Amino acid sequence: GDRIDYFKNSVAATLAHRAFCINLAYEFPAFGPDVWGITASDSERGYLAWGGPPRDPDIEGTIVPSAAGGSLMFTPELATKALETMHEKYGAKIYGKYGFVDAFNPKTGWVDTDVIGINAGIILLSAENMRTQNIWRWFMQNREIPLALQRVGLVKYNPSVRRPNAQDQSKRHHHELRSAGLR
């Protein structure tokens, strides 16, 4: 069958996630092109594993910085802009000793007081990987990883295999977003 480029798939997923969040701005004005991110996190009502699409009924305006921050290596400009804008708009309310808070809700003023390592960690790892690519390089130096990838059928990209060009992928991506009701 067709091979999947998981990097490009991650870029497309990040773009779809951002578009989904932008479309939430009609209900939650704090969301927009430069402030976006929904993923499992704390909320005023406790821990929630929200996401989308489709529109999860638990979405109530909480923004999770690690959702954008975890995509720094896939969409560096968009994810960096999101983190910078969150920091500029909300400052010390959402950024402290360990970096960004886990989650915050601009609509209600709620800010999580917990520091959740997996969410703080993904921002740190993604930033370092975006900057140096060391994280991926070190990961692949672990001898078990290439063997595991081979055993599950993941192979390196072969440029001699015909792949859709960027225009084809862009058209397909926009079609998928329209089909999902995001455009």
Model-assigned labels for residue ranges:
Residues 1-183:
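Ser/Thr/Asn(+Pro)-rich, low-complexity disordered segments
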